[in-house]
Design a protein with these regions (language model features):
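Bacterial N-terminal signal peptides that target proteins for export
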Residues: 1-10
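Bacterial N-terminal signal peptides
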Residues: 9-19
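Low-complexity, acidic/polar, glycine-enriched regions of mature
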Residues: 23-200
Length: 200
């Protein structure tokens, strides 16, 4: 028969092991440079609306489908991969007066926290999009600023699909718009990301 001391030792072992089991559910997902993921920005100024896009997005996401609030991720896109519908404008955008691709070659987006509504379950349902609020950091022109994004997360056995939208300002990232184009370039830039991350 099991004595009291043995029972206590077994109970302690189970309690200590529980956090390890919980952490084991976290999986690392990779965003590959395969054209499936994208980042888009829109400048809606009085005289012109400009849209730019890149499909050169890479990064990693560590997430537990049983508790999506623990998710963390880091993603980047090369500045030189941004494309609008105007080659000359693309050159200016990547130049030292704007995003300065030579000095700051990448734009970064980092997920630091995922927040759900008060009544929302932290566990993702397979193949169903879940609405989330994402807190993180956005780096452009060498300047990092906090961002809050609204979006969705959809999980399958081998993939996480994340969509998020947020707004950044050129002023926050120390990008000065020349007066001659001030009515064609907005200070507030709408950013949206569409990330397909596959399990390692």
């Amino acid at each position: 028969m099991m004595n009291s001391a043995t029972r206590v030792c077994l109970m302690l072992a189970v309690c200590l092991a529980a956090p390890v089991f919980a952490r084991a559910d976290a999986t690392t997902y990779r965003v590959l440079d395969d054209g499936k993921s994208s980042a888009t920005f829109v400048s809606d100024a009085p005289l012109e609306t400009m849209t730019g896009k890149t499909s050169k997005v890479t990064g990693t996401l560590t997430a537990d489908p049983m508790d999506i609030t623990t998710a963390k991720g880091s993603f980047k896109s090369p500045v030189v991969s941004l494309r609008t519908d105007n080659e000359l404008r693309d050159e200016h955008l990547q130049g030292d007066g704007w995003l300065d691709a030579k000095k700051n070659p990448n734009i970064h987006f980092e997920i630091t926290e995922v927040v759900l509504g008060k009544k929302a379950a932290t566990e993702l349902k397979k193949n169903k999009a879940t609405k989330v609020q994402v807190k993180g950091k956005f780096t452009a022109h060498g300047i990092t600023k906090p961002v809050a994004a609204s979006g969705t997360v959809k999980w399958s056995d081998a993939e996480m699909h994340i969509k998020a939208k947020f707004t950044v300002t050129l002023e926050d990232h120390e990008i000065s718009v020349p007066s001659i184009v001030r009515l064609k370039v907005a200070n507030d830039i709408a950013v949206s990301v569409d990330l397909h991350a596959v399990a390692k």
